[in-house]
Regions:
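Mid-domain Rossmann-like dinucleotide-binding core that forms the NAD(H)/NADP(H) cofactor-binding site
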Residues: 1-48
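C-terminal hydrophobic helical "lid"/dimerization subdomain
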Residues: 17, 75, 119-177
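Helix N-cap at the beta1-alpha1 junction of Rossmann-like dinucleotide-binding domains, i.e.
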Residues: 29-30, 71, 94
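Short glycine-/small-residue-rich Rossmann-like dinucleotide-binding loops
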Residues: 48, 68-69, 91-92
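Short amphipathic alpha-helix with an adjacent loop that forms part of the alpha/beta core around
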Residues: 49-59
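N-terminal Rossmann-like NAD(P) cofactor-binding module of classical short-chain dehydrogenase/reductase
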Residues: 62-65
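Helix-to-beta-strand junctions that scaffold the AdoMet/dcAdoMet cofactor pocket
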Residues: 81-82
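Rossmann-fold dehydrogenase core element
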Residues: 86-88, 99-139
Length: 177
C-alpha cells in the first residue's frame, strides 16, 4: 500500500483482513506505528530506504495499490513488483509518472488505473467493513467551515477523511483523529 492517507489507511485494513501480507509504504518514521496499528506487517519509510528495493528484499509485490497522488513516488514502484505484478493507481497524480519500460517488459509487470467500483462492489466493501470492523479515521470540521475543509482537502492537507458535522453532532460512530 503506497500512501497511508484517506484511501491508504482503509486499504491497509482491507488487505490485512483479506489475509494478504501487507506492506505499507510512506514517508517518515512517525507513520510506522499507525501503519502497523492499522494492520501492516511491514512499514517501508521512503525517507530512509528505496521502496522498490525493500519490496524486492521481501520477494517482490504481487500488487501495489498506489493511493498517494505522486507520480514521482509511483513510477519507481514498478521495480518493486514481482514477476507479473500489478501497480494499481487510484490516487491521481498531477505530474506524469516517470518509469523505465524494462521492468514492465522483462517481468511481465503491468500498471492499471481504477476510479471506483460498481454499486455491487461498493455494497460488498461496506458489508466486509462491517463484518471485519474496518472503520475510517476522520477529521471533523463544523459545517460552517466547509469551504476551509474543502480547501485543505484540495491542497492535500487533510488527514484521512474530512467529515462535515452539524451542531447536533452528525458523524457519530467513526474513529476521530
Amino acid at each position: 500500500m503506497q500512501g497511508i492517507g484517506g484511501l491508504g489507511h482503509l486499504g491497509i485494513q482491507f488487505a490485512r483482513h483479506m489475509g494478504f501480507r501487507t506492506v505499507a509504504i510512506g514517508r517518515g518514521g512517525e507513520k510506522e506505528k499507525l501503519a502497523k496499528d492499522l494492520g501492516a506487517h511491514v512499514y517501508v519509510d521512503t525517507a530512509v530506504e528505496d521502496a522498490a528495493a525493500a519490496l524486492q528484499r521481501l520477494g517482490g509485490a504481487r500488487a501495489i495499490l498506489a493511493t498517494a497522488p505522486s507520480g514521482d513516488a509511483m513510477g519507481p514502484l514498478v521495480s518493486g513488483l514481482g514477476a507479473r505484478g500489478k501497480l494499481i493507481v487510484v490516487g491521481v497524480p498531477l505530474e506524469p509518472m516517470q518509469l523505465s519500460a524494462f521492468p514492465l517488459v522483462f517481468g511481465g509487470r503491468s500498471i492499471y488505473g481504477s476510479l471506483a467500483g460498481t454499486a455491487i462492489e461498493t455494497e460488498d466493501a461496506l458489508a466486509f467493513s462491517v463484518l471485519e470492523n474496518i472503520r475510517p479515521m476522520i477529521e471533523t470540521v463544523p459545517l460552517e467551515r466547509a469551504a476551509e475543509a474543502y480547501d485543505r482537502m484540495i491542497k492535500g492537507k487533510a488527514r484521512f477523511r474530512m467529515v462535515l458535522v452539524t451542531k447536533d453532532g452528525a458523524a457519530q460512530g467513526a474513529t476521530v483523529n
